[in-house]
Amino acid sequence: MDLPLERHWRLVVTPPAPGAWNMAVDEAIVEHHALGVVPPTLRLYGWRPAAISLGYFQSLAAEVDVQACAREGVDVVRRPTGGRAILHDREVTYSVVIAERLLPGDVVHTYRVLSLGLLAAVRRLGVAAELADVPPVGAGGPTAACFDTPARYELEVGGRKLVGSAQTRREGVILQHGVVPFDLQAERLFLMLRVSADRGALARTLEQRATDLGRCMGRTPSVEEVQEALAGGFAGALGLELTAAPLSEGELRRAAELAGRKYGQPHWNERR
């Protein structure tokens, strides 16, 4: 299997932030990496306040109850990547930004390569995870929630999805980001989604199809513990040398523009 052609990556750890800012930072890193200004980057971050991120192709009006989100104090933001809705709260989120020329291959291949870093990370935490090869067929079909079925090469434990990820490409650069959840909060998630079936039943189904670190480890890990495992897992599995560094001034300026003009605006979040 082909590993990344560039071994020297930047590790960026940013504090919890609103959803619009988080998505803006990921895009700013993509733009700056495309220009050759910054190296391939592994970013680790959190969300404050909690947020629901919507897949790029989802309909906000059809799938998310915005008023329920407001009552819960939960932001809503559309991701630049596909997939379904995710509740971001008790978790660590990762993003990887790397030029396609430095990680050649189609989406499935690159997804598998990056999943090896995630697999090594959760195994460092003592979790006996595996890569899902063929998605299982579950009764009832998928819902608007991201974690209801594992996709190919996503992490699962005992047949239950643990880490959900999504990938997009632009300007010759791969952006993949995903969630390592401490607590699924299935009931809370379905309170904020527009669904036709019984919310309690959907939450129970999700808990049968997905899991979280709290259940796998028998305790809730610290954010720092999981961040350390992710950095070590990616470095070890992909043969990387990670150098901790902050976002550049240019990335910060561009992220502020994108958060204000794009990810924080109705024209982006309500576009479908």
Where are each of the predicted segments found?
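Active-site-proximal flexible loops/turns
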Residues: 33, 90, 161
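Well-ordered beta-strand positions
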Residues: 45-46, 86-87, 156, 181
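A glycine-rich, hydrophobic loop/mini-helix early in the fold
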Residues: 63-104
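Extended cationic-aromatic binding surfaces that line active-site or macromolecule-binding grooves
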Residues: 47-60, 93, 97-98, 113-120
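Catalytic beta-strand/loop module used to bind and position nucleotide/cofactor moieties
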Residues: 100-236, 266, 272
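Short connector loops at helix/strand junctions that flank enzyme active sites
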Residues: 47-49, 71, 87-91, 150, ...
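Gly/Ser/Thr-rich beta-alpha loop segments that engage phosphate groups in nucleotides
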Residues: 57, 84-85, 166
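Active-site loop/lid in soluble adenylation, ligation, and acyl-transfer enzymes
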Residues: 1-63, 67, 71, 75-79, ...
